[in-house]
Amino acid sequence: MGAAPSKIVETLLEDTNFDRDEIERLRKRFMKLDRDSSGSIDKNEFMSIPGVSANPLAGRIMEVFDADNSGDVDFQEFITGLSIFSGRGSKDEKLKFAFKIYDIDKDGLISNGELFIVLKIMVGSNLDDKQLQQIVDRTIMENDLDGDGQLSFEEFKSAIETTEVAKSLTLQYSV
């Protein structure tokens, strides 16, 4: 992958928070991460990004970056994903990304089981399953405004906006 095709760059300029120079610098970084020169980043390459492997949600983050569900992250998906976490990413974009981390089956709702799985990834063995299930049940009960037993994006957003979580969803990185 030499210079990014101009059509892709034009689309990225339109759809992301990056300018042309930033996209070019990120393209160079992408090419370094793509060690096998396949044109996409596989899970091992993704995990080699500084700071990513230490994040317990790294696997879920990669799955959300991988918009076409190919199992790899291509250049366009990489830039689009990073754009959300840039300082110029909107609060709503960041909340939608966070929601997708929890919405494992991509049905637009966070079920009790999905919330349990993601929180289990985050807390590991610090809580036993019974304690964690109580937290999950309480979280759903307190925030499920329509009573369907799941959290919609709007319910998730409402719950999160009362905290400082959205502000913390900005990554500092140099391009």
Swiss-Prot record:
One cellular component term from this protein's GO annotations in UniProt: calcineurin complex
Binding site for Ca(2+) 1: D34, D36, S38, S40, E45
Listed GO MF terms: calcium ion binding; phosphatase activator activity
SUPFAM superfamilies membership: EF-hand (SSF47473)
Keyword Calcium belongs to the record: yes
Signal peptide: none
One Pfam family linked to the record: EF-hand_7
Further remark: This protein has four functional calcium-binding sites.
Name listed for the protein in its UniProt record: Calcineurin subunit B
